[in-house]
Amino acid sequence: MNKKTRIAITGPIGRMGRMLIKEIQNNKHSHLTVAVVQKKHQLIGQDIGRIIGIGEIGVLISDELNIKKNDFDVLIDFTRPAGTLEYLKYCNKFKKNIVIGTTGFSKEEIDIIKSYSQKIAIIIASNFSIGINLLFQLIKKTTQIIGKDSDINILEYHHRNKIDAPSGTALEIGEVISKVMNWNLNQDSIYYQKGITGIRDAKKIGFSIVRAGNIVGKHTVMFSSCDEEIKITHTASNRMSFARGAIQSALWIHKKNTGLFDMTDVLSL
């Protein structure tokens, strides 16, 4: 009988943290053993299951990851860049693998993550949904066929509380397109604003961003020529698809030694 993968969750009280815990509890191959919050959080010592409304599960909220080093196999982190880098230090010190869903990293921070992947195994993804990762493949193929003849625009929609823009997923879509077209995403992007913007440059990716209400996530990529237009859209109805993908990633990376991976590795795309 295979042992369950023991998982630690950071930010367990947030929306994504709650979804992750519920999915872990429903997955026969995983087991929640650690729930980590910031120092001096008012809920430290309380049962996380009771706090998120699923009843007591025997896991007490803690702010001390180091004393829990023998209690988990993989850490899942959906917090903020500064917090993620601190958790990476712990994982590196105790040789624990990590799944990172945090977005908004700078190039320098990504380089730090890459350096840690020489010592532990890391999965980092802007979006853990199976659907969005299939979308990446569709975008790649479409760009290969009609990219040079199209104006390409990415439209992304998220809830009003999302703090980074464009979304990590939108930027990853942009990277997929840029690699095919041999463009530099940082230099070849348009972020629409008011005023006289001039004629649209054909060799650019346009980004449009909406923050409103409780939108979980919607991404549309438009390929527009003078004769026709193709739209490819992915809409997330809830966050459970992200949670399932993150748990699947944790199970996949459990026995890995070192390396930097993403969802294309997990899904064998």
Swiss-Prot record:
Keyword Amino-acid biosynthesis: yes
Top-tier EC class: oxidoreductase
GO molecular function, one term: NAD binding
Compartments in which it is found: Cytoplasm
Signal peptide annotation: none
Residues that, per the record, bind NADP(+): 39
Pfam short name (any one): DapB_N
InterPro entries named among the record's database cross-references: DapB_C, DapB_N, DapB_N_CS, DHDPR_bac, NAD(P)-bd_dom_sf
Catalysed transformations (reactions): (S)-2,3,4,5-tetrahydrodipicolinate + NAD(+) + H2O = (2S,4S)-4-hydroxy-2,3,4,5-tetrahydrodipicolinate + NADH + H(+); (S)-2,3,4,5-tetrahydrodipicolinate + NADP(+) + H2O = (2S,4S)-4-hydroxy-2,3,4,5-tetrahydrodipicolinate + NADPH + H(+)
Domain of life: Bacteria
Keyword annotations: Amino-acid biosynthesis, Cytoplasm, Diaminopimelate biosynthesis, Lysine biosynthesis, NAD, NADP, Oxidoreductase
Function: Catalyzes the conversion of 4-hydroxy-tetrahydrodipicolinate (HTPA) to tetrahydrodipicolinate.
Description of how the protein assembles with itself and partners: Homotetramer.
HAMAP family named in the record: DapB
Family label: Belongs to the DapB family.
Name of this protein: 4-hydroxy-tetrahydrodipicolinate reductase
Originating species: Buchnera aphidicola subsp. Acyrthosiphon pisum (strain 5A)
